[in-house]
């Protein structure tokens, strides 16, 4: 069974609908959605002036998927949401990052695993911890420890949002 952890983010248009659409696209592509984190609002990362993001993390499984298959699914979800890649770290309808696949490590420039910046981004670590309190990032350590090591201002910048991505 291939298990992937994916980060979702949106700051253009109906942000909540974009995140929900990503979950629906993953399901339609045959992935079993194991867990969906609460949604968080966060300031943009990377220095480009833009609106705040809504962020979440999903854990998905598929017995027949390899790491590149998860990347293809992530890009398909982005495409379905109208994602364009005009400005690095710029505004986007949907961003889906493959954070981890079965603890695999890879230096492939097309898909580096674990995601090279996951360990330093509170907007990834907070929701990841929600769906897997024992999560580890290969080569970095426990998600809980990585989050605790970040500056308080960064952790505090990840604000709970009332948006629900799945029915409870």
Segments (PLM) and residue ranges:
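Flexible, gly/pro- and Lys/Arg-enriched active-site loops
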Residues: 45-54, 64, 68-168
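Short hydrophobic/aromatic beta-strand micro-patches
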Residues: 7, 59-61, 101
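Extreme N-terminal starter segment of soluble prokaryotic enzymes
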Residues: 1-6
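Short, surface-exposed acidic-centric catalytic microdomains
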Residues: 21, 25-65
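Short N-terminal binding/cap micro-motifs at the start of the first secondary-structure element
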Residues: 14-16
């Amino acid at each position: 069974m291939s298990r992937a952890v994916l980060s979702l983010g949106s700051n253009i248009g109906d942000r909540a609908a974009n995140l929900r659409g990503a979950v629906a696209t993953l399901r339609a592509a045959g992935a079993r959605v194991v867990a969906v984190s609460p949604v968080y609002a966060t300031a943009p990362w990377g220095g480009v002036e833009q609106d705040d993001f809504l962020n979440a993390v999903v854990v998905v499984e598929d017995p027949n998927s390899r790491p590149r298959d998860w990347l293809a699914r992530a890009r398909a979800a982005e495409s379905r949401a109208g994602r364009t890649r005009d400005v690095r770290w710029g505004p986007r309808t949907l961003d889906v990052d493959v954070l981890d696949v079965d603890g695999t490590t890879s230096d492939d420039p097309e898909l580096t695993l674990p995601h090279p910046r996951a360990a330093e981004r509170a907007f990834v670590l907070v929701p990841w911890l929600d769906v897997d309190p024992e999560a580890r990032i290969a080569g970095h350590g426990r998600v809980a420890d990585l989050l605790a090591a970040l500056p308080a201002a960064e952790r505090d910048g990840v604000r709970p949002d009332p948006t629900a991505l799945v029915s409870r």
